[in-house]
């Protein structure tokens, strides 16, 4: 095939992640002939990465609480998620031979825990349904005639599709495929796109050399993080450049907006959130004897070395000596350690992204109003959510909605 040849197909799905594969499944079940294109050598690279530590498919909390996790985008995502609910997602997984269970936190996982068995079963089903795959096909926009342009190992390729589903992801983990190159091509078509920003991301902190050399990679367990009126219990991890982890990610949206506007923001960490300031002061008032201060804190309050190191960092920043603080002041500090965040970690290290195609650019069928026949699903759209199964649920659900939208479009 020369570059002037155009391959004509029914439906092109661009992006072989959860949203794209789900759109392909819906389309194939509806009788459409589907080709899935992806720049990577194989499907769902980021999905597989997400499943390495346990594939959190969705969450079991009541649907109203679940939907509220999407914040400003809730109203626009309600129809899609109400049509493909967390219960529907669990039933879908079980139909693929991968039953699920609810963890202690309410999160839902496949019993196999990993993503690979589910993905293998899914790809096998899609192949049986007649879906074809074209890997190492990097989409580069449209030509003057509206044909899809791809760069492949064999050179440029043009594809004319009756309908297209774009499911190229956001801008996180670019090495796994979602590099956000699509932003420029859609912006050139007049599509309004909210700037992409890292979501569920760690933050930079100017740790002292002593602290980061000693405590890089150390967890802070059983803590509570607070910012404004929000407080989250969980864990965090000290990194060489700052702090990350589930509790940090839960507050990252609000923290990100302030740090991007003001250049810094203060996060407070409670190291012993189950104890009041008075209870802490009482325990700290016990004579220390000949113990080192760190040993005293370890025995009196079960503070880990990294927690004590964090207190030292805070005291030094205030120009004070930690061991010289009166029990009442130290008790207050232990449950309100101020950490100054100076920026987000790079988008490449973020779990997901905020921003994307604004919802006013699509109709109720997830079709771009300016580009009839072109539908969008997944993280390309302007929404964000915390970890806990909300990201995958919305990706799956918008994939279903886009697939259904294409079927209606082709049927009309």
Where are these regions (language model features)?
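N-terminal Rossmann-like FAD-binding beta1-loop-alpha1 element of flavoenzymes
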Residues: 10-36, 402-407
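Short hydrophobic core segments
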Residues: 12-14, 37, 139, 158-172, ...
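Glycine-rich FAD pyrophosphate-binding loop
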Residues: 28-52
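Residue-level recognition of phosphate/Mg2+-coordinating polar/acidic sites
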Residues: 29-30, 42, 63-65, 82, ...
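Short beta-strand to alpha-helix junction loop
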Residues: 77-85, 105-124, 173-178, 205-208, ...
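A conserved short coil-to-beta-strand element within the FAD-binding core of flavoproteins
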Residues: 135-147
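Glycine-rich loop(s) and the adjacent beta-strand/alpha-helix scaffold that form part
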Residues: 163-207
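A conserved FAD-binding loop/helix module that cradles the flavin
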Residues: 172-185, 189, 382-411
């Amino acid at each position: 095939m020369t570059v002037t040849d155009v391959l004509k197909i029914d439906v092109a799905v661009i992006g072989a992640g959860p949203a794209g594969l789900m759109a392909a499944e819906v389309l194939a079940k509806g009788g459409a002939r589907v080709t899935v294109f992806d720049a990577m050598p194989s499907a769902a690279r980021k999905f597989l990465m997400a499943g390495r530590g346990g594939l959190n498919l969705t969450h079991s909390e009541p649907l109203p609480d679940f939907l509220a996790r999407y914040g400003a985008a809730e109203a626009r995502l309600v129809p899609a998620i109400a049509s493909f609910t967390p219960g529907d997602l669990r039933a879908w997984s079980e139909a693929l031979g991968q039953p699920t269970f609810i963890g202690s936190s309410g999160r839902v996982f496949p019993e196999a825990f990993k993503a690979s068995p589910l993905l293998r079963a899914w790809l096998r089903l899609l192949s049986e349904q007649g879906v074809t795959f074209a890997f190492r096909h990097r989409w580069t926009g449209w030509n003057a005639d509206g044909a899809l342009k791809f760069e492949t190992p064999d050179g440029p390729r043009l594809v004319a599709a009756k309908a297209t589903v774009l499911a190229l992801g956001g801008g996180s983990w670019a090495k796994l495929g979602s590099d956000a190159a699509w932003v420029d091509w859609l912006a050139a078509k007049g599509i309004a796109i909210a700037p992409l920003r890292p979501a569920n991301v760690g933050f930079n902190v100017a740790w002292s050399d002593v602290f980061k050399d000693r405590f890089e990679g150390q967890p802070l367990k059983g803590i509570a993080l607070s910012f404004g009126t929000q407080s989250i219990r969980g864990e965090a991890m000290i990194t060489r450049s700052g702090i990350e982890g589930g509790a940090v990610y839960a507050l990252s949206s609000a923290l990100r907006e302030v740090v991007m506007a003001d250049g810094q923001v203060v996060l407070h960490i409670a190291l012993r959130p189950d104890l009041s300031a008075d209870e802490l002061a009482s325990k700290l008032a016990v004579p220390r004897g000949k113990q080192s201060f760190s040993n005293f804190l370890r025995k009196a309050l079960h503070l880990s070395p990294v927690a004590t190191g964090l207190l030292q960092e805070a005291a030094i920043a205030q120009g004070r000596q930690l061991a010289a603080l009166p029990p009442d002041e130290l008790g207050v500090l232990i449950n309100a350690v101020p950490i100054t965040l100076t920026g987000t970690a790079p988008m490449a290290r973020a779990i997901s992204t905020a921003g994307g195609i604004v919802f006013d650019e699509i109709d109720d069928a997830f079709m771009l109003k300016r580009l009839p026949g072109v539908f969008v699903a997944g993280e390309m759209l302007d929404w964000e959510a915390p970890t806990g199964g909300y990201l995958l649920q919305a990706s799956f659900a918008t994939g279903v909605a886009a697939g259904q939208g294409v079927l209606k479009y082709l049927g009309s």
